[in-house]
């Protein structure tokens, strides 16, 4: 195995990635090498990750519940705060039960473990998150990939699987992280019911944003708690029986130490803001509409997103890199996505509560300076 040759190959394809050292964030600004940039990369959509905490409340919490129980939840790491949080969160979202994980990635790995060694086939959207793909793969499950958001294609696959002994499982992101498109939850529920399937929805980029009404007919909802929640961790909503099965078969839960207690404190505080701070969602929705108005003028042929995730699809790595560099030079930090994350090079722009219309104006003013040519698809 030639490691240097592999790295050289990645570099030659223009796909080489590096970790960017970040100093700090403050509202809509991010600090890199002592320079400030408007931050259009954060998943902290509601700005809850930067709320001010009461130091004494935090210290009282740690004094009561310790810093870290230093064990897995199935041994001695199952803090009573887990139960309190799981009950409060599942009641707010009207689910029978909930289970907190160390990350949304871990939650998806655990979910698919419950189907291992069973006669099932998974029907997965073409653009589902990598954690879903890995969960299916690591559990050794049969799968069918349907075209992105093409529910006629999904139904044609479901209709061809007629063996009553095979359990069908449909899985989809609610909001897709790379392009901001939204799943049709009502259509997925209809197909689940028609074909007697289990339905799993990953709500990592929608939980807390009120983009969907959660249906009682969704069997399992998974989510990160590090996006709109501004905390750290993951969660699964399900029936009590499914939760118990995950506890007994979910390897990423069984073999991981529990979250430090202070993380549970931040989840607790975030829940309060998710429930009470409706003004955060209202401002974010207004910013999204303002962004889309300018986006339509500059990119009339590119699809709109009514979520906080916006993207610009480029026709080459070179044009994407040039646009990314130009924005960075003008003090604007966006996400640059490339293969294998996306099939075409893409600049992703994430809006947050902290942005204002001046930030969006500045972004588009810089993009208008760029010689479009054949730069965009």
Regions found by a protein language model. Give the residues of each.
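N-terminal "arm"/small-domain region of PLP-dependent enzymes with the aminotransferase-like
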Residues: 2-5, 9-67, 197, 214
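Structural motif of enzymes handling amino- and sulfur-group chemistry
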Residues: 258-277, 283, 287-292
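Active-site PLP attachment segment
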Residues: 214-245
């Amino acid at each position: 195995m030639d490691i240097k040759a592999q790295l050289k190959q990645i570099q030659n394809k223009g796909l080489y990635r590096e970790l960017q050292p970040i100093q700090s964030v403050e509202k809509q600004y991010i600090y890199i090498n002592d320079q400030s940039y408007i931050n259009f990369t954060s998943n902290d959509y509601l700005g809850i990750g930067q709320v001010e905490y009461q130091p004494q409340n935090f210290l009282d919490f740690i004094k009561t519940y310790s810093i870290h129980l230093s064990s897995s939840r199935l041994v001695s790491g199952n803090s009573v705060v887990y139960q309190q949080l799981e009950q409060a969160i599942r009641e707010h979202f009207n689910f029978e039960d909930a289970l907190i994980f160390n990350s949304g990635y871990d939650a998806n790995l655990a979910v698919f473990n419950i189907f291992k060694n069973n006669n099932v086939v998974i029907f997965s959207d073409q653009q589902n998150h990598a954690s879903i793909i890995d969960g299916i793969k690591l559990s050794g499950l049969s799968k069918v990939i349907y075209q992105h958001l093409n529910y006629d294609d999904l139904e044609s696959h479901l209709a061809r699987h007629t063996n009553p002994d095979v359990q069908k499982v449909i899985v989809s992101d609610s909001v897709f992280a790379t392009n901001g498109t939204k799943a049709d939850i009502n259509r997925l529920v209809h197909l689940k019911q028609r074909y007697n399937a289990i339905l799993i929805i990953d709500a990592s980029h929608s939980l807390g944003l009120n983009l969907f009404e959660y249906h009682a007919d969704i069997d399992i909802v998974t989510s990160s708690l590090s996006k709109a929640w501004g905390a750290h961790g993951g969660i699964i909503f399900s029936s009590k029986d499914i939760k118990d099965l995950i506890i007994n078969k979910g390897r990423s839960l069984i073999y991981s130490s529990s979250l430090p207690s202070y993380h549970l404190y931040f989840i607790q505080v975030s829940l309060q803001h998710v429930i009470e701070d409706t003004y955060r969602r209202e401002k974010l929705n207004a910013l999204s509409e303002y962004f889309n108005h300018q986006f339509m003028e500059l990119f009339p042929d590119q699809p709109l997103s009514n979520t906080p995730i916006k993207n610009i699809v480029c026709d080459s790595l070179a044009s994407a890199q040039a646009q990314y560099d130009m924005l960075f030079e003008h003090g604007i930090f966006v996400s640059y996505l490339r293969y294998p994350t996306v099939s075409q090079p893409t600049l992703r722009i994430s809006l947050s509560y902290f942005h204002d219309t001046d930030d969006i104006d500045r972004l588009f003013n810089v993009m208008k300076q760029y010689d479009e040519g054949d730069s965009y698809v």
